[in-house]
Amino acid sequence: MRPSSNVTEFVLLGLTQDPDVKKTLFVMFLLIYIVTMVGNLLIWVTTIGSPSLGSLMYFFLAYLSLMDAIYSTAMSPKLMIDLLCDKIAISLSACMGQLFIEHLLGGAEVFLLVVMAYDRYVAISKPLHYLNIMNRLVCILLLVVAMIGGFVHSVVQIVFLYSLPICGPNVIDHSVCDMYPLLELLCLDTYFIGLTVVANGGIICMVIFTFLLISCGVILNFLKTYSQEERHKALPTCISHIIVVALVFVPCIFMYVRPVSNFPFDKLMTVFYSIITLMLNPLIYSLRQSEMKNAMKNLWCEKLSIVRKRVSPTLNIFIPSSKATNRR
């Protein structure tokens, strides 16, 4: 399927045209990307490999971290490469691919946060029935549903955009391909089209964000009936989830609950959502949860101990013992 357009390539103006600022941003994005990948993959490996994190809550956290790592890899390297180029050109198919991946993973993460909120609600409101309600099969099905939700949302965006005529010019004042910058290139009035985009993106974000805030309030209310020790154990998980929900949904609402328009501030918001937030998520979850920190410490100390035991005999072959040296 081809779009109703003669445009085959777009030129992105990027974040800035200042060479010095580009170099600074490149170094900053590279460091953030490394921290993001290390943090998210560390959580994923720790959650999968640590017996102490056998709770199904950490099952969802593991795949949220994996999703963030994939999202970061899909966005950050392209942004960093663009900072080294004088002209940022992207083909129509690559632009559509970037848009598809962005909304696929972003949509899946939104639905996964809903699933995680439901998981916490069941764990706190019905602790005796938790393992019956949230068994592993149910968790896998909910994870698949979250991915399908993101896929449907992304496909709707792409199919909708492909059916519209793009007249040009082919210059996009943005750092990535996104819906509103592309809609500004259309040959027709974008008012009603913008309402459709708001319905498929912004309103969904607002409704889910409101639902999640209410659910967090209900969960916090349930915690009042718990003992002080149980509250102290459950509260960091709830607070971490609330912070991550705010980091994900506030930029989404800002960018998609409005008429079709492209503001300079959108570039910073895109960087915050697609780079900064993905770095903060693992830090928030790991630093606020003692179970996660202890599991990381125990797992990696155990791994280092195993490596040390395997390496020591090999080193002893090459390093003569003190007794052998004295005999000589």
UniProtKB/Swiss-Prot annotation:
The chain crosses the membrane at residues 24-47, 56-77, 99-118, 138-156, 194-217, 234-256, 268-287. It comes from the Eukaryota. Its main location: membrane. Disulfide bonds join 95-187. GO terms for molecular function: G protein-coupled receptor activity; olfactory receptor activity. It is found in: Cell membrane. Keywords: Cell membrane, Disulfide bond, G-protein coupled receptor, Glycoprotein, Membrane, Olfaction, Receptor, Sensory transduction, Transducer, Transmembrane, Transmembrane helix. SUPFAM superfamilies: Family A G protein-coupled receptor-like (SSF81321). Residues 1-23, 78-98, 157-193, 257-267 are extracellular. It is a multi-pass membrane protein. Glycans are attached at residue 6. One of its GO terms (cellular component) is plasma membrane. The keyword Ubl conjugation does not apply. Residues 48-55, 119-137, 218-233, 288-328 are cytoplasmic. Belongs to the G-protein coupled receptor 1 family. Odorant receptor. This is Olfactory receptor 4A16. The gene is OR4A16.
